[in-house]
């Protein structure tokens, strides 16, 4: 079984040299992602497409490959195909007949062909010949060119015939690392998750900077969001997760800064701290989830004052999006339920925030602030490769027991994503297994029977351990990690 990866149209519009560079990078990215699924995956780059070969002895990997390819930036769509050789137009029909005979029985159909290469026929010739043959020699209701029940999709490339099994919509955008790196200021809320995704999709290697205002529980929740975004959409490249202990900064702002200016000052201090981190790693821009008028600090006047705190470019991909549109996007990318369970800390420090900050007044207030405190908190920041979150979880799950056997009365919660759980459901004799995806567990766990003990399960143990840590931080003691 093969997949034909079609490049995003914007890539095809580039000059030859740029298109070749982008295509090479996409090929490498696909290989990096799929080798984590199976080392036997083969990836071949052609002029306008990339061919992915599923190991012939592992057809069960088709669905996994399809899921991964659908989330790699730079892909317009993917078609899963069966490959055949042919020597004539009749040979094409003879191979299509047994393939589609049962599928089109009792239904209307049409044939659509895409062809490239040198042949003594064109695409329309094939559509007519194959369509006519299927119409005469099957029990189909007939040909219907508009809105048929079944569309027979064929692709021809030189002497190869590809019968399309299914079409998978791609992510679009540009291949990862075709653009410069960015540093996303992530809080775990709706906005920062979506803004991070937007730059991953656009081909920028997106690192994460987290200003910790809420302790270990807050950090665990944000790490889940960042790890999810990286694992699902950016796994081809390693990125950094930087955690900055910002409680001392908030404490000093509360003590020294005028109440109305607190929100703007906090954002300016965050930008200066993030700039220091970005400069250290050669990152050229900051990304925030700010949206015009959403909160008091996000008026044009205040955003202008915030921008004056740094010379580094600040990018705001959500600036004109409505809140509901942002929430809808977070639902699509899988961060909505994370965001629901993570409180917004920045908004609680200013009771009467200004919406028209004056730069001179803000700068005067900042004279009360210890500038070297920024250097101290940045120096104490914890920087980690996001891939090491798994190892960190293995070390930190000390308060949560890890078990390989299920005791009487214990319930397993399968926290895998729905498509993974459906593909290979966890079935254990005489044991209740509840399927609650990891991104819903934080909001649904409180509704479960508190007298029961719950064992969290996922394939690799990363999300189950993250969720266990998060629940322990919330005060739950009836949770363990299940690693059979």
Curated annotation (Swiss-Prot):
Its EC number is 2.8.1.4. GO terms for molecular function: ATP binding; CCA tRNA nucleotidyltransferase activity; tRNA binding; tRNA-uracil-4 sulfurtransferase activity. The keyword RNA-binding applies. PROSITE patterns: RHODANESE_3, THUMP. Residues 406-484 form the Rhodanese domain. Disulfide bonds join 346-458. Keywords: ATP-binding, Cytoplasm, Disulfide bond, Nucleotide-binding, Redox-active center, RNA-binding, Thiamine biosynthesis, Transferase, tRNA-binding. It is an enzyme of class 2 (transferase). One of its GO terms (biological process) is thiamine biosynthetic process. This is tRNA sulfurtransferase. It comes from Shewanella frigidimarina (strain NCIMB 400).
